[in-house]
Amino acid sequence: MWCFRLSRHFIVYLFSLCAILLLAGCVQSRGGFVSKNHVILAEQNPNTHFEQEVMIVRLSQVLLVGKMSNEERASLHFERGVLYDSLGLWGLARYDFTQALALQPKMASVYNYLGLYLLLEEDYDGALEAFNTVFELDSGYDYTHLNRGLNFYYVGRYHLAQQDFLQFYQADTKDPYRVLWLYLNEQKLKPQEAQTNLVERAKGLSEDFWGTHIVQYYLGHISVEELQQRASEFAENSQQYAEILTETYFYLAKQKLNVGLVDEAAALFKLAMANQVYNFVEYRFAAFELMKLKPVQTEDEKEEKSAVTKAIVF
């Protein structure tokens, strides 16, 4: 098992490295994170996820032989599902979440995850139903405002997205990521006000979040080269650096996409994924944006991808 785990990560690393070398030539930049001969990525350690993998083994053993109530079993399935999700094993995570839901049908957190998976499969109606169910079970479930807002955003219902993003922002006005999604939505909904609102909201942001520096870049207060320098200073370890780069490449890509530079945006979305921070919103939606840039799937293909989840959840 140890040898298999090491080789799997090594193969993924080699594949990512080859892809990244090709991507470097796709992004035109005067410096900073990406140039023709240089791409910045976090160091990939094969043992990064070792603790999560050990926890999965332990939870699996308990689920296999342990005697427990339905509530306890549902909780363990949910916990293992979260671990699978953090490793990018979304099919296995979905299985555990649906098992948890079968045992405890009123777990709001499970509907939140399943709604997110449905959204990423472009099943917007199914995702909306799941997110609405979250609020029926727990009206204070904060992050579902982000997820439902994203659902509205990606179908072009920017007015409804604004309501969710605004409520999400108001719950924590110091969080720059809430400000960034409001800004991205307002660029579509009311572009003449988006920059002014970003300037005003930026005044209350906390320097504890890396995203505050991304906001400063969006405002034109710092260059991409300065953003790169701050990233290396902000990160305390390679895992945090991977998270910072995932976020940065994603929001740089959104900026490129919004001005019509599709090829550069696609390359940056791929770089956002290259740091393998699977459970970050920016990783998930970098993959989603890339899927949307590909030729449109047929309706039959979309329905086939989400049929299993919908059958169990609804």
What are these regions, as identified by a protein language model?
Residues E79, N112-Y113, N147, W181, ...:
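Canonical tetratricopeptide repeat
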Residues P46-S60, D85-G91, L119-Y124, Y154-H159, ...:
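Helix-turn-helix repeat elements of alpha-solenoid scaffolds
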Residues V65, S69, L103, E136-L137, ...:
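Structural marker of alpha-solenoid helical repeat scaffolds
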